Amino acid sequence: MAQTGRLAAWLGKGKTFEIREYPVPDPKPGALVIKIALANVCGSDMHYWKGELDMEKRGRTMPINPGHEHMGTVYKLGAGVATDSAGQPLREGDRVIYRYFIPCGRCKACLRRQFKSCPSRQSNWSVTCDVWPHFQGGYGEYFYLGP
């Protein structure tokens, strides 16, 4: 398996992207690593790039690995991961599509399956790519999907 992977690190408002290389993380229990096959450019990504949304003013530490519309294949499974969210068996090499945000699964919105309304949801790509697990957005070779 690959030891390192590349991603596009966005340096911030008025700046550009830089290709960076980081170690491919081993997934924690309940997590997995996706080998990205396809990533789309969303309108919100264009707003960041044009400088219309200042991520640093929103409290983000730069650089970030943006991109939240992507799909790929399972590269590594963390301990305890045997099925997908529908209960179907999941193995390395399986094609998958997934959410870029992580809902809590316990609030009123989640229990109604309205995951985008979860007040506690977390977004991986809002964290700098300079810290583990590095691959937290769609513009790269891998994506770390947390438990």
What is each PLM-predicted segment?
Residues A9-T16:
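Extracellular beta-rich ligand/substrate-recognition surface
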Residues A37-L38, W49, G146:
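A secondary-structure boundary/capping signal
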Residues H68, D84-S85, C104-P147:
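NAD(P)H dinucleotide-binding glycine-rich loop of Rossmann-like/cofactor-binding domains
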